[in-house]
Curated annotation (Swiss-Prot):
Broad class of the protein's primary localization: cytoplasm
Domain of life: Bacteria
Compartment(s): Cytoplasm
Record keywords, A-Z: Cytoplasm, Methyltransferase, rRNA processing, S-adenosyl-L-methionine, Transferase
Gene assigned in the entry: rsmE
GO cellular component: cytoplasm
Chain coiled-coil ranges: none
Organism: Rickettsia conorii (strain ATCC VR-613 / Malish 7)
The protein, known as: Ribosomal RNA small subunit methyltransferase E
NCBIfam families: PRK11713.3-2 (NF008694), RsmE family RNA methyltransferase (TIGR00046)
Length: 244
């Protein structure tokens, strides 16, 4: 039997009792899932892993469960970061949802010259990634950082950074640098609708740890470019291991 999953940001251990008192969790279990006392579900987080739980009691504003068995143990892996320019909210939510399903570990909202917006709703994005984490059977939701300018982000980041460049030669694809992907912490940088400015492209090219990549001959929307690049990196690099 396949049990529903719920992300819990608190300590989990076998045979422990957990109280769920948030409005979201109580509504989800009682109203959406319609679970009853003695029904099972799965609780998880990236620190402790995933556990099979049994509902002991359901109150008006809370419910209690007991963790019966550990189903998955936590583990670590290389970091795969998506630094994506801030685009329209519905498109950004789509990109982040898909990125979470594909195993991204960190999300950086980037402020670039041609961004339509300069801030994001972190609370809403967090809800989006938790839902995608629950759905995709991974343990750890991606970390979402505050919006930052592309200039400041490049200054502080020293891992391998791949930036999608529609002006790049088609043969300079991710496949060409696949040997650099193994066991590396990688950042994928995607610009807004309209791409990067010439100054931003020059800035990106000036760093030794950046590589310009082509995603093919077609011009892709920002959200499509992000998903395409992540999928290619996970397929060709060590990041194609089981999603954490």
């Amino acid at each position: 039997m396949k049990y529903n999953r719920i992300y819990i940001n608190s300590r989990l251990a076998e045979n422990s009792k957990i109280e769920l008192a948030s409005d979201h969790h109580v509504h989800y279990v009682k109203t959406v899932l319609r679970l009853k006392v003695n029904d099972g579900l799965r609780l998880f987080n990236g620190t402790d892993g995933e556990f099979l739980a049994q509902i002991n009691d359901i109150g008006k504003n809370n419910l209690s469960v007991r963790l019966k068995e550990q189903l998955k143990k936590p583990y670590t892996k290389s970091t795969l970061t998506l630094a994506v320019a801030i685009i329209k909210q519905d498109k950004l939510m789509l990109a982040i949802n898909m990125a979470t399903q594909l195993g991204i570990t960190k999300i950086i909202p980037l402020i670039t010259r041609w961004c339509q917006f300069r801030s994001v709703n972190i609370e809403r994005l967090t809800k989006c990634v938790i839902e995608a984490t629950e759905q995709s059977e991974r343990l750890t939701p991606p970390i979402i950082e505050k919006a930052i300018t592309i200039q400041d982000y490049l200054k502080k980041n020293n891992n391998l950074m791949l930036y999608a460049n529609e002006h790049e030669k088609e043969e300079n694809s991710i496949l060409r640098i696949s040997s650099s992907l193994s066991n590396s912490d990688i950042t994928i940088i995607v610009g807004p609708e309209g791409g990067f400015t010439n100054d931003e492209l020059e800035l990106l090219a000036s760093y030794k740890n950046t590589k310009s990549i082509s995603l093919g001959s077609n011009i892709l929307r920002a959200e499509t470019a992000a998903i395409t690049a992540i999928a290619q990196v996970r397929l060709l690099g060590s990041h194609c291991e089981e999603i954490a």
